[in-house]
From Swiss-Prot:
Family statement: Belongs to the small heat shock protein (HSP20) family.
Protein name: 17.2 kDa class II heat shock protein
Domain sHSP as annotated: residue spans: 38-153
Naturally occurring in which organism (per UniProt): Ipomoea nil
Compartments, as annotated in UniProt: Cytoplasm
Induction conditions: By photoperiod, by light treatment of dark-grown seedlings, and by heat shock.
GO cellular component, one term: cytoplasm
Taxonomic lineage: Eukaryota, Viridiplantae, Streptophyta, Embryophyta, Tracheophyta
Length: 155
């Protein structure tokens, strides 16, 4: 169990967990540490999804991230992946120390399976005031074919 997921973020716990992670005899069917961290990042990243007649809009909170820190990708399986990472400021002023650390740091991630009518070539992403808006246009439905009339001849 990763104690960092439960709020124990002291360097001593990091050392203990890193040491425990070196055990090569662990159960191979257990979820990997990366999977668990990704699952936590996905659960902690709120998102709204809207369906319009011509598009789908994904609205995701990405607080504290610049547009260059956010990655939006679509893979071959129609999966839209949105990720970024917010890091703690490395610089500390002389004599200053944190009394309380409540702002979330770490990985932000969401994955969505796009519907078949999503146009993977027409995706836009705009980040403003810590909110990312990803718009995926729909492929227009095919025009219904008119029935062909066949002339009946007298034989």
């Amino acid at each position: 169990m990763d104690l960092r997921l439960m709020g124990f973020d002291h360097p001593l716990f990091h050392h203990i967990m890193d040491y425990a992670g070196d055990d090569k005899s662990s159960n191979s069917s257990a979820p990997s540490r990366t999977f668990m961290l990704d699952a936590k990042a996905m659960a902690a990243t709120p998102a709204d999804v809207k369906e319009y007649p011509n598009s789908y809009v994904f609205i995701i909170d990405m607080p504290g991230l610049k547009s260059g820190d956010i990655k939006v990708q679509v893979d071959g399986d129609n999966v839209l992946s949105i990720s970024g990472e917010r890091k703690r400021e490395a610089e500390e002023k002389e004599g200053a120390k944190y009394v309380r650390m409540e702002r979330r740091v770490g990985k932000l991630m969401r994955k969505f399976v796009l519907p078949e009518n999503a146009n993977k070539e027409k995706i836009t992403a705009v980040c403003q005031d810590g909110v990312l808006t990803v718009t995926v246009e729909n492929v227009p439905p095919p025009e219904p074919k008119k029935p062909r009339t066949i002339e009946v001849k007298i034989g």
